[in-house]
UniProtKB/Swiss-Prot annotation:
Binds 1 zinc ion per subunit. It comes from Oleidesulfovibrio alaskensis (strain ATCC BAA-1058 / DSM 17464 / G20). The active site is at residues 332-333. Pfam families: Histidinol_dh. Its EC number is 1.1.1.23. CDD domains: Histidinol_dh (cd06572). This is Histidinol dehydrogenase. Pathway: Amino-acid biosynthesis; L-histidine biosynthesis; L-histidine from 5-phospho-alpha-D-ribose 1-diphosphate: step 9/9. GO terms for cellular component: cytosol.
Amino acid sequence: MPCRTLTYSSEADWQGIRDMLCGRENPENSVEPVVREIMDAIRSDGDAALAGYTRRFDCPDFDPSSLRVAPDAIEKAAREIPRHDLQIITEAADNIRHFHSAQKEEAWFITRPDGTVLGQMTRPVDSAGLYVPGGQGGNTPLISSLLMNAVPAQVAGVPRIAVTTPPRKDGTLNPYILAAAHVLGLDEIYCAGSAWAVAALAYGTQTIAPVDFIAGPGNIFVTTAKRMLIGTVGIDMIAGPSEILIIADSQADAAHVAADMLSQAEHDPLASAILVTPSPQLAAAVHTELEKQVTGLDRADIARASLRDWSAIVVTPDLNSAVELSNKVAPEHLELLVQDTWGLLGSIRNAGAIFMGPHSPEPVGDYFAGPNHVLPTMGTARFSSALSVQSFCKKSSIIAASQTFTQTNAAKIARLARLEGLEAHARSVESRLS
C-alpha cells in the first residue's frame, strides 16, 4: 500500500496523527554552527567570502565581477525564451498582482469630539531581499517563487527589491528566472545562493547593500540563516516541508484526490499528503489510484517516500469530524472536495489556503490564480498567514492629542504612571497643565 490508513474519532487518534506529523520537523540546530560560520565570514569578508562559497558549492570558476547580473543579460533572456512561455509568465504575474492589489491598506484617522485625532499610517519597508532557490542546479527554474515573493513587495510599494539565486555550474542563471525578473521590471539580481546569500542580504557586502526584509523559500541552511537573523532583519516566515490535507466525501473523484495528493508528495520526501474522508469506499479507491499514478512520475521515488513516511488516508465517522481533524492539523493547503463546499467553509478555522471544489486543485493556486503560495506550514496556520502585501509593510500609530484631551486626562495618566513607578512620565504630562 502506498500510504497508511488511519481512523480518527478520539483524542487518542489525534495524538497518533500529530506524532506522525511532528516527525517531519527539520533538525535546524544540527546546522547552526555551520550557518553561524558562514554568516560570520560574510559579515567580515563580504564579496570575497560570497565568491568563495559560490566557487565551493555552485560554480568552480565563479568570477566575482559577475556577482550582479548585467541589465542586458536580463533583457536578452526575455528575448530568448519561447514567446508563449513569456506570455504565460506575464499572465501569471498579472493575476498575482490583481489579487494582491486588493490587500493594500490606506491610512485612516478618527477624530474625537474634543478634537483629538488618532490614526494609523502604513508604509512599505525601504528594501526587500528575495531568495529564489536554484531548483536542481538551475535546471528547474522556480519561476513561481520569484513571482509570488516579488509581486506583493511591488504592490506594497517597496522602493528597492534585490533578488539572489544560485548560479548554475557554468556561472549563469537560468534564463527563465531572468525573463521573469524582466517581466516584473526587476534589475537588481545577484548570483548567490544558500545561507551566504541570505547573510549578504542581511549584512551587506561591497556589492550588495543590506536590506530590511528577507523573503523566499530554501533548504535547511537558508531556513536556519533566516531564523538566526530574526531581529536583524524582518523575515517572511520559517517554512517547513510542503503539505496538503484533502477533505472529501463519497462523491469525490478518487483519481482527482490521488493526483492532488501526489502534487504535494513529489515536492520532497518530507512532504505530507493527507486525505480525510468519512467514506471507506473512497479511501480504498484512492489507495488504488495512488499506486497507479505514482508509477508514471519522474519523481516517483520522492513521492513514494513522502506517501510512505508522512502521509495518510484517514477515515472519520462524518464530515464534522473531518473538519475537526483538519482544524487541528492546520494544513498549509486544504482542499474541500465535497458537495457543499461553501457550506463547509464556515467551519474551517485553520488553513494557509483553501481550495474549493473539483476545479480548484492546489497547483491552480500555486501558479496562476493569484493568491500567494508562500504559506504557513507545520501547524503554524493556527496563528499565521500567507505572504501578503502587509508582510512588506509597517504600521505606525498617529496620536495628535488636543489640549482639552491632555489637560482633562492628565491626572489619570499621571496616576497610572506613578502606579508603575515612573515619576518622569507623570511629570511629563503634568507639565502640560501649566
